[in-house]
Amino acid sequence: MRHLLLALLLLGGARADDEEKKEDVGTVVGIDLGTTYSCVGVFKNGRVEIIANDQGNRITPSYVAFTPEGERLIGDAAKNQLTSNPENTVFDAKRLIGRTWNDPSVQQDIKYLPFKVVEKKAKPHIQVDVGGGQTKTFAPEEISAMVLTKMKETAEAYLGKKVTHAVVTVPAYFNDAQRQATKDAGTIAGLNVMRIINEPTAAAIAYGLDKREGEKNILVFDLGGGTFDVSLLTIDNGVFEVVATNGDTHLGGEDFDQRVMEHFIKLYKKKTGKDVRKDNRAVQKLRREVEKAKRALSSQHQARIEIESFFEGEDFSETLTRAKFEELNMDLFRSTMKPVQKVLEDSDLKKSDIDEIVLVGGSTRIPKIQQLVKEFFNGKEPSRGINPDEAVAYGAAVQAGVLSGDQDTGDLVLLDVCPLTLGIETVGGVMTKLIPRNTVVPTKKSQIFSTASDNQPTVTIKVYEGERPLTKDNHLLGTFDLTGIPPAPRGVPQIEVTFEIDVNGILRVTAEDKGTGNKNKITITNDQNRLTPEEIERMVNDAEKFAEEDKKLKERIDARNELESYAYSLKNQIGDKEKLGGKLSSEDKETIEKAVEEKIEWLESHQDADIEDFKSKKKELEEVVQPIVSKLYGSAGPPPTGEEEAAEKDEL
């Protein structure tokens, strides 16, 4: 997998950025789009602010749900109703984004996901019931776009203005297709994603802002909900350089939860003979409680898991100890040390050469993980300065500040490096390298090749990434043909192959026949995994339509609630001798009671009525009540619509 890492330079005059500053992009936000949780930050008044959502939480679950009433929920509200609506609550879209249907990790994941994942155009798509008996299929990009929209709205509510530009982070191990799909998700959400940067590097930026002196080797250990990355960075006089990176795109807190779940499912089967897996809702209830218990075990030694009417009416009650949790996951915990060992080897450093260890991601709160890291580094304490949940968004916000043209960032400029070698296949399946690993990008390299046989009319250019000498052991990125080569003996035609990588790590490969000027090229992101511009446009329109539908639905619900609260408020006041009940003649009281009961009955059988119906029913009720109350109060004022208003009127 080709991925980019960032080197951070402190330059006196940030010339590279002056170009970008010419375009006024407004406030650029930094978004950590996580597998399980997302976080948004902004560079404001010379410092980073991590922004809390409407629930007051600084991290937002990367969840989207569709209720039977046709309402779409995003974030906390979606996660909170997971147990009651598992088939239509979508999470872990990041596990699917930019991947093909046949990807073994996709096939592995869909076994555990409670919602339906289907194949469409050789890619995984998510199928849910969006209410009213309607089924809809979404690309993972669309689900991620909904989460990004939530983060965008969170920032807009805080800033009090529109946000259109963002820096979004991805795991260092994301390949081109996954990076491009993440950018597409931004486009669908109405965001111009100015940069895609790697999570561990973003964390290092957050960490590096306060520690600009001296020469240091920093190891970033990032274990989140779904991915694991280790990066080794060096800082020398304010220059960050990424020396090596490693990890596992498929290891995180959710995998630890899964182990505990499997343990309790087996235990329950052993005790009762019943298989809980048959009941999606029971499994999801267990998942929620297991996650809670896991968090509790970071600060205490045991946690109770209690679930009322867990399965077939029976309750569930078990204790999970920290020791048992560690035992169930010990192989996974220990496996995190292999990538650490690998980055040290790749960068020719000894354990004792590491100056700082930075722990990032919620799973690094697990005491056993902290202990293993500490033991690996012979007792060295990891740094505690950064909130592990927010470090990535913090770094993204710093980079967003640079792109906003915010002077207070001290003219930081980011340079990317490409830590996997890129090349093409030549005769015998040999990997011929054009761009070596750790080359600073943007970059451009060319080399002349020729034909392998006489009168060969076509050459096939196969583009690979990886460090192995034979292409079969490396990762194929894309293939294209250069045709129309005039007949000539082998070795005579001159074919120039050019590799070019831009700042976002998107690779373009061109082949040109120097004799004829014939050219062909490939942009590696445009493989079969990439959404077409038409699909993106359709998804953007869908997203807007959803926003419009959400607004209409909210207006309808508001109108229903207004009628309902008006009717019940009147009912309460008529029944209260201290209020209207004690002031009305029995005839007037009966008139209002009858009208109110009529509306309440109508409401019960017309929950799905139109906004106009709710409004007209409220008006009908007002027309009955108004003259009676006006007569009572001796004025033409409107009737009391609630107890507070009634109290205010009494004071008048």
Curated annotation (Swiss-Prot):
Keywords of the record: ATP-binding, Chaperone, Cytoplasm, Endoplasmic reticulum, Hydrolase, Nucleotide-binding, Signal
Activity regulation (UniProt): The chaperone activity is regulated by ATP-induced allosteric coupling of the nucleotide-binding (NBD) and substrate-binding (SBD) domains. In the ADP-bound and nucleotide-free (apo) states, the two domains have little interaction. In contrast, in the ATP-bound state the two domains are tightly coupled, which results in drastically accelerated kinetics in both binding and release of polypeptide substrates. J domain-containing co-chaperones (DNAJB9/ERdj4 or DNAJC10/ERdj5) stimulate the ATPase activity and are required for efficient substrate recognition by HSPA5/BiP.
Listed Acidic residues bias regions: 642-652
Region (Interdomain linker): 407-417
Motif (Prevents secretion from ER): 649-652
InterPro entries: ATPase_NBD (IPR043129), BIP_NBD (IPR042050), Heat_shock_70_CS (IPR018181), HSP70_C_sf (IPR029048), HSP70_peptide-bd_sf (IPR029047), Hsp_70_fam (IPR013126)
Annotated signal sequence range: 1-16
Keyword Coiled coil: no
Disulfide bonds: none
Gene Ontology BP, a term: maintenance of protein localization in endoplasmic reticulum
Description of how the protein assembles with itself and partners: Monomer and homooligomer; homooligomerization via the interdomain linker inactivates the chaperone activity and acts as a storage of HSPA5/BiP molecules. Interacts with DNAJC10. Interacts with DNAJB9/ERdj4; leading to recruit HSPA5/BiP to ERN1/IRE1. Interacts with ERN1/IRE1; interaction takes place following interaction with DNAJB9/ERdj4 and leads to inactivate ERN1/IRE1.
Designated name of the protein: Endoplasmic reticulum chaperone BiP
Organism name: Gallus gallus (Chicken)
